[in-house]
Amino acid sequence: QEITNEFLDSFDEEKLMKLSDWMNNGAFQTIQEFKKLSKEEQKDIIEYLMEFTAYEEVEVKGRYYLLVHAGLGDFSEEKSLDEYDVNDFVWKRPDWDIPYFTDPNKFVVVGHTPTLGINGKPEIFYKNNFIAIDCGACFENGTLACLCLDTMEEFYV
């Protein structure tokens, strides 16, 4: 769709804020790379995004993991996951000093915030049933990390 004044007038403030966030977080590069794909690849990506979920729940060897991009905004243990907004999972960073779950076998696995900014180290960070796995691969002194939930073995590239 062409971006005209009329089109922009149809946006409410919330939509404009979301568009602004996207523009500030790589929209131009995303569009340029998307346009290079075949129509079939573009269709597959759009279908994937339409089925996107903001979180994934996984149980491994009696441990429960909530996998999210960033964290859980406005967290309450009594609040069900479907009561959260997608922004709570994608943008809101957790408070590492507050345990979110009383159950020692419940964990929140997050990315988004490089561990370099949490404790100054490019390694997987564990605290209060949080597991932060973004080790700042995009930074000169960062690394790409992977955590095997079956064994809790850490891998770094």
Label every PLM stretch briefly.
Residues 1-18:
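Core catalytic region of metal-dependent phosphoesterases/phosphodiesterases
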Residues 4, 141-145:
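Short, charged, surface-exposed secondary-structure boundary motifs
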Residues 14, 21-132, 136-142, 155:
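Acidic, His/Gly-enriched loop-helix segments that form or flank divalent-metal centers
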